């Protein structure tokens, strides 16, 4: 004859955070004030026989289990434990995690902004991406001279604020390599003169280092 197993969904309690000296008897002694107990067991290690720090208590009825779980963090055998219905799982001792507390301490203005930075530290796209600073589609770059009109029209869509922040001698912190003294495309006279002197094809940035002709080389 098979016995009908009792439904313990709302009567079986998980008890965590127990001290290692807690036994079945001491666990039962604490919970018996809430009502009749069917079972009280402290889970122990099979090899050492020592407590693993948690156990289960099955109350006789649902009302007794609700009274036992009213205090989620009772003091059992001198230590703060955590109590919850077993089917709900272990309940943390503190509902607010460290991450939640840390986020609450931040100012809402920093949470809403990207990367947690204020607007004056967010560089415009023209500064963040060096490839965008000088538009690549300049047809005249294939020729020895730079088309001043095409280069000027390509720069009209940039704002004045973004253009003024561009460093002439950028530091590694901004993501650029140091160019020394550079001459931008908006100076066609310097670019044309350098091209005619050196014979090298113009690039987006031209090294502006005037060379002095030596008298002995011209002889």
Swiss-Prot record:
GO terms for molecular function: RNA binding. It comes from the Eukaryota. It holds the Pfam family RRM_1. Keywords: Cytoplasm, Developmental protein, Differentiation, mRNA processing, mRNA splicing, Nucleus, RNA-binding. InterPro entries: Nucleotide-bd_a/b_plait_sf, RBD_domain_sf, RNA-binding_reg, RRM_dom. It is found in: Cytoplasm, Cytosol; Nucleus. GO terms for cellular component: cytosol; nucleus. Gene3D superfamilies: 3.30.70.330. CDD domains: RRM_RBM24_RBM38_like. One of its GO terms (biological process) is cell differentiation. Its main location: cytoplasm. Residues 11-88 form the RRM domain. Belongs to the RBM38 family. RNA-binding protein that specifically bind the 3'-UTR of VegT transcripts, leading to maintain their stability and stimulate their translation, thereby playing a role in germ layer formation. VegT is a localized maternal determinant essentially required for endoderm formation. Also has some proneural function in the open neural plate and in the context of retinogenesis. May also act as a mRNA splicing factor. May play a role in myogenic differentiation. This is RNA-binding protein 38. The lineage of its organism: Eukaryota, Metazoa, Chordata, Craniata, Vertebrata. The gene is rbm38.
